[in-house]
Amino acid sequence: MRVLAAMSGGVDSSVAAARMVDAGHDVVGVHLALSTAPGTLRTGSRGCCSKEDASDARRVADVLGIPFYVWDFAEKFQADVIDEFVSAYARGETPNPCVTCNQKIKFSALSAKAVALGFDAVATGHYARLSGGRLRRAVDKDKDQSYVLAVLSAEQLRHAAFPIGDTPKPQIREEAARRGLAVAEKPDSHDICFIPSGNTRAFLGERIGVRRGAVVNADGTVLAEHDGVHGFTIGQRKGLGIAGPGPDGRPRYVTAIDADTATVRVGEAADLDVREMLGRAVVFTSGTAPSGPFECAVQVRAHGETADAVAELVGDELVVRLRAPLRGVAPGQTLALYRHDPDGDEVLGSATIAGTSR
């Protein structure tokens, strides 16, 4: 099998590439250049997509004895990931750019180019498993990345390979060291790769500008002014611009964002509870939507807990009714669906949260 190994320069993708070589596949390594301007992607060894990371990936490819290339996907990354990230926050939503990158870049643009060049699969260092064509959680639940892959279609998964999903992260590092890979102890990336400073509010402010509005309580009383809804997300407690807790002494949280009126509403923790979610851009990883309501477990954050629910496709929207309230759910987040069984490992699909109700 001809395999294109996506190599970020980190330990996970490096071991993934090595395992594909060990399996006897015809492997070619590729690193994606995603920066459109100097300084837009972090430098150093903590992230992906920097020049240092490209050099690390090349050195690993040399050790493995495989061809290696750097492909320029900067313009598409800017349009499909960065610009959409900014637009979503301007709409008062809370997106996950890693989800978008997987859906639009790694398993769409990259995969399409790979197939056009005669490759059978794209191998990545994601912590997830494929079994019988079905996407499943990784063995290492702490590192599991099935959530950010739940947006992939059956066709996208058909050309994907996740060689390290059956191994805990500590063993991956040990394996890299045994193989003599210099990235064995390279730190993991935790922040958004295109926000080197880690200051998301400042990054968004530079691109959206000032759009002043009001912070109000549940009855509409104005408590403060703000410079833009992009500085807030559902469940946020700090940086609200209001003095201390509410009159009852309880902390206040962002409970709703109206981008049209630039209004941010705050309330108590209990006001964050939701019992129903509406999803758009629905994807079922099997390629077939269940008929009628179905039991499932839902996850709304990359490493969040799952919650039992009943979901149903109504037209082109997904209606999800929770068995118990879920707190702090924001429009724009990805809603991942898992099979409701003792293991809870199989990914059924996903949707983008369009709205919630109590």
Swiss-Prot record:
Tell me yes or no: is RNA-binding among this UniProt entry's keywords: yes
Q: Active site at which residues?
A: 101, 193
An example Gene Ontology CC term for this record: cytoplasm
Kind of enzyme, top EC level?
transferase
Residue ranges, annotated region (Interaction with tRNA): 143-145
Q: Where in the cell is it found?
A: Cytoplasm
Name the domain of life: Bacteria
Task: Tell me the InterPro entries matching this sequence.
Answer: MnmA-like (IPR004506), MnmA-like_C (IPR046885), MnmA-like_central (IPR046884), MnmA-like_central_sf (IPR023382), Rossmann-like_a/b/a_fold (IPR014729)
The record's section on Pfam families has: tRNA_Me_trans, tRNA_Me_trans_C, tRNA_Me_trans_M
Q: Which CDD domains match?
A: MnmA_TRMU-like
Where, by residue number, does ATP bind? 6-13, 32, 125
| Disulfide cross-links | 101-193
**Which GO terms fall under biological process for this protein?**
tRNA wobble position uridine thiolation
Q: What is its EC number?
A: 2.8.1.13
Q: Which PANTHER family match?
A: MITOCHONDRIAL TRNA-SPECIFIC 2-THIOURIDYLASE 1, TRNA 5-METHYLAMINOMETHYL-2-THIOURIDYLATE -METHYLTRANSFERASE
Q: What does this protein do?
A: Catalyzes the 2-thiolation of uridine at the wobble position (U34) of tRNA, leading to the formation of s(2)U34.
Query: What family does this belong to?
Result: Belongs to the MnmA/TRMU family.
Name used for this protein in its record: tRNA-specific 2-thiouridylase MnmA
Q: Which gene encodes it?
A: mnmA
